[in-house]
Each structure stands twice: as structure tokens, then as C-alpha cells.
């Protein structure tokens, strides 16, 4: 989810998410029921949502983290 205040949005969708991550202005929400999350976000203008099934990239990011410059 991109747009809006990620902290505020995370509180709104927290009951429907198994895990939430915030990286910069983007909120990553891992949920078994994306429709519940979309329903909570209806009416919030200026949001961009991307929905996709989990894959090996998610496993990699979970193990290594999202920040590239973390270990420099």
C-alpha cells in the first residue's frame, strides 16, 4: 500500500493482517483475506494497492530484510 500515512493505515488494517511492515512510505501487509483489507481502505483517496500471491522473494526478504544499505 503506497500513499497516505503508513502508521495510520497500519492501525486500520492490523486486525486483518498476519504481519505488517513499513518501509519508507510503503506499507506491506501479509493477510489471508485481502478483501477485508481492501474494504477497510475504501474511501481513502490517493492510495495505490498491489496485491499478489507470496513467492520466494518474500522468503528472501523475510530472511535478509528490506534495507540494502544496512550492512555497509
Swiss-Prot record:
Subcellular location: Cell inner membrane
Segments forming a coiled coil: none
Any single GO CC term annotated in Swiss-Prot or TrEMBL for this entry: plasma membrane
Keywords of the record: ATP-binding, Cell inner membrane, Cell membrane, Membrane, Nodulation, Nucleotide-binding, Plasmid, Translocase, Transport
Molecular function GO terms recorded: ATP binding
Membrane topology: Peripheral membrane protein
Protein EC: 7.6.2.-
Protein task: Part of the ABC transporter complex NodIJ involved in the export of the nodulation factors (Nod factors), the bacterial signal molecules that induce symbiosis and subsequent nodulation induction. Nod factors are LCO (lipo-chitin oligosaccharide), a modified beta-1,4-linked N-acetylglucosamine oligosaccharide. This subunit is responsible for energy coupling to the transport system.
Subunit relationships: The complex is composed of two ATP-binding proteins (NodI) and two transmembrane proteins (NodJ).
Family: Belongs to the ABC transporter superfamily. Lipooligosaccharide exporter (TC 3.A.1.102) family.
Name of the protein: Nod factor export ATP-binding protein I
Organism phylogeny: Bacteria, Pseudomonadati, Pseudomonadota, Alphaproteobacteria, Hyphomicrobiales
Amino acid at each position: 500500500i503506497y500513499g497516505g500515512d503508513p502508521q495510520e493505515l497500519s492501525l486500520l488494517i492490523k486486525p486483518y493482517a498476519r504481519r505488517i511492515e513499513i518501509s519508507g512510505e510503503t506499507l506491506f501487509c501479509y493477510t489471508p483475506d485481502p478483501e477485508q483489507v481492501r474494504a477497510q481502505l475504501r474511501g481513502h483517496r490517493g492510495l495505490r494497492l498491489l496485491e499478489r500471491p507470496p513467492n520466494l522473494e518474500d522468503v528472501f526478504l523475510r530472511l535478509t530484510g528490506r534495507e540494502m544499505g544496512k550492512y555497509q
